[in-house]
């Protein structure tokens, strides 16, 4: 039976989402539908940021990130490797850790090459890595929320552009934007004082967090009516 372990890897988490929600996703939702669900729950999470409501931030980020994994599964994008390629314990733009973009003012993205020995082994390890690259004391919670919204917009644009042209370069852009969006999930979790791996374990340790079944047996009406 699928479950999320406390020390889950990103790949294990993505596979859990595939096993539990893949059937319903295939039956009920297109890529654009799932993108709407990501937007829906991120916006609810940002309402939590505005109200300084940690519980509202937490549940909505957890649900949004699981829809994000569902969309990546539909597109057959294994995100863990892509995140490491984009952020090999370094800022993807200035190639420094911690990020020094404000000091260096790089005019273009620098080439990044990481040390595989420093690659995190777990989701919690990746959250720690992003904490080191982008220290939470350098931004406010609101800053982290706005950045997540910005990257969500860029990810959405990449999806829609690819659906319009169906070319390889467009698909590669989706992968890059997905890695950027993942990084912003991690930095908002960190700014809010939320351990993503621990909360995913608490929420999804017994299959679907609503019906407790695998595969999920929630109806379309249940999914669309979920309150958070």
Question: Residue locations for each model-derived region?
Answer:
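Flexible "arm" and connector segments at domain edges
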Residues: 1-228
């Amino acid at each position: 039976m699928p479950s999320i372990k406390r020390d889950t890897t990103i790949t294990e988490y993505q596979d859990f989402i595939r096993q539990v929600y893949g059937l319903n996703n295939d039956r009920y939702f297109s890529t654009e539908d799932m993108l709407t669900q990501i937007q829906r729950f991120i916006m609810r999470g940002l309402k939590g940021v505005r109200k300084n409501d940690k519980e509202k931030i937490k549940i909505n980020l957890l649900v949004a990130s699981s829809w994000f994994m569902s969309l990546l599964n539909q597109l057959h994008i294994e995100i863990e490797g892509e995140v490491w390629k984009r952020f090999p314990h370094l800022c993807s733009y200035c190639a420094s850790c911690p990020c020094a973009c404000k000091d260096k003012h790089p005019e273009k993205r620098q080439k990044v090459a990481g040390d595989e020995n420093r690659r995190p082994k777990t989701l919690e390890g990746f959250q720690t890595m992003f904490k080191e690259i982008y220290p939470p004391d350098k931004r406010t919670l609101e800053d982290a929320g706005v950045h997540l919204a910005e990257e969500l917009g860029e990810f959405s644009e990449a999806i829609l552009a690819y659906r319009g042209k169906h070319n390889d370069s467009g698909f590669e852009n989706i992968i890059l934007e997905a890695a950027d969006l993942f990084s912003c999930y991690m930095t908002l979790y960190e700014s809010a004082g939320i351990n993503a791996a621990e909360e995913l374990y608490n929420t999804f340790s017994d299959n679907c967090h609503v019906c407790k079944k695998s595969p999920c047996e929630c109806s379309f009406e249940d999914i669309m009516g979920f309150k958070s």
